[in-house]
Amino acid sequence: STPKPSSAASDVYKRQALYTELGRFMTGPYGHLVTRAIHEKHTYKEYIGVDACAVNLMRPAMYGAYHHITVLGKENEPCDHMYDVVGGLCENNDKFAIDRMLPKIDIGDIVYIHDTGAHGSAMGYNYNGKLRSAEVLLCEDGTHRLIRRAETPRDYFATLDFLPLMKPLFED
């Protein structure tokens, strides 16, 4: 006999699995990259160099992802300067923002890049010898906790086993 439509649909749903990637939904809005303006360049464009780079947040460099940027202490100032906000890698796509209207940024200003929780640190890498940054958790009561320390040069070389390669150099 032919199964009833409701019974057939029920059998199909029982065999189906649903998989989702909830990173951006669940954690995206809760991470932020805090960086400092350390360079400026005035050519045919205005560039602000920060002490973070694509190592810390690859999404804008990789596929042009938009992340809102706030210049701390200047939230109420007019966004009347157009900048490319760039990192220090030797790659032309190491940019957090292109032609972004922001308040005037001075050397030393804190540049706050929003919504980096899902794929900021998780996509990090050590290109150009850059070390991963520390991560700080801001708790609901206003306190903060270091949840991941910054990498050190020792960390960078920790998985490299080059002593066997060097042994012939020291043999007679």
Language-model regions, residue ranges each:
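Single conserved hydrophobic/aromatic residue that forms the stacking wall/gate
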Residues: 1-9, 13
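Charged (often Lys/Glu-rich) extended helix/loop segments that serve as interaction or gating elements
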Residues: 15-172
